[in-house]
Regions:
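Iron-sulfur cluster-binding electron-transfer modules in prokaryotic oxidoreductases
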Residues: 1-277
Length: 277
């Protein structure tokens, strides 16, 4: 439940500050926020930014970065809002298909119309795009066709991307970690490179996009195997130079951070490089 998640996370944030919770965990961010950064979205807009549940509570700064990038591209943004709730991805991962379908129907009912629905979490994006298959209805298929990863949408609209005014700074090297839900499920991982190109030197891993070990709920159900898979990914990161890592999925980011990697969302790098003058 979104409200329980919000208040539970605030209690965890207090627990972290009191030293009652370990910071080095793949189950939650190293520093949970007590306050959510203020949104600049409007009540009407050209696109809907899907906020979800875990992402909205644990990584709201990514949503704010997405808003900043889209607005800098000349795009007006509105948020999906609390009535939309969870996309149902974790329910589907756990085999709770009926509950996943209920979540999917609620999401669709809360987002009628034709506005593009942009997502900044690869796992959520993959789930939303799968609604046509999950529900098998015309409504679900039409809804899924409205869904795009934020970076995918920007890459499809280069004229918008070109409008973003950037600071004149050096392009630091960053390692791109492709979430499975972006590379294999959505097959739009190249968009991350197009979006990052003007602000960073993209460093590729040599493991051909192998999983980091997070895998949705996989790291909870099979922690030992998950850590072995993560070890392989961390070795690939070391071979690539141990630069800052960018990942477009919260589960991957948390999982790699717990192993010592410095990880941010690609949109955070782009937002940071925007010239606000």
């Amino acid at each position: 439940h979104p409200r329980l998640l919000l208040w539970g996370s605030r209690a965890m944030a207090v627990g972290q500050r009191l030293g009652l919770l370990p910071r080095n965990s793949s189950l939650w961010p190293k520093k949970l926020s007590l306050r959510r950064p203020k949104s600049t979205a409007t009540s009407t807009g050209e696109v809907v930014l899907f906020t979800g549940c875990v992402m909205d509570t644990w990584m709201p700064e990514v949503h704010r970065a997405a808003e900043k990038v889209l607005q800098a591209s000349g795009t007006t943004v509105m948020l999906s809002g609390p009535t939309t709730g969870c996309c149902g991805a974790l329910h589907e991962h756990a085999g709770l298909t009926d509950q996943a379908r209920q979540r999917a129907q609620q999401v669709m009912d809360s987002l009628p119309g034709q506005h593009p629905i942009l997502v900044d979490a690869a796992g959520c994006g993959a789930a939303l795009k799968n609604y046509g298959h999950l529900l098998g209805t015309q409504q679900a298929q039409e809804f899924a066709e409205r869904v795009f990863d934020v970076q995918e949408w920007l890459a499809k609209h280069p004229e918008r991307l070109a409008k973003i005014s950037l600071k004149e700074t050096e392009r630091p090297p960053v390692i791109v970690q492709d979430p499975c839900h972006l590379r294999h499920a959505q097959q739009c991982h190249e968009a991350v490179r197009e979006v990052l190109g003007p602000v960073a030197q993209v460093v590729e891993l040599d493991d051909e996009g192998l999983c980091c070990g997070a895998g949705g709920s996989f790291s909870l159900v099979h922690p030992d195997l998950s850590q072995e898979v993560r070890k392989r990914k961390m070795e690939a990161i070391a071979r690539a130079g141990n630069h800052e890592v960018v990942s477009a999925n919260p589960g991957c980011a948390l999982h790699l951070e717990a192993a010592g990697a410095k990880v941010r969302h690609p949109l955070e790098l782009l937002a940071e490089a925007i010239d606000d003058k």
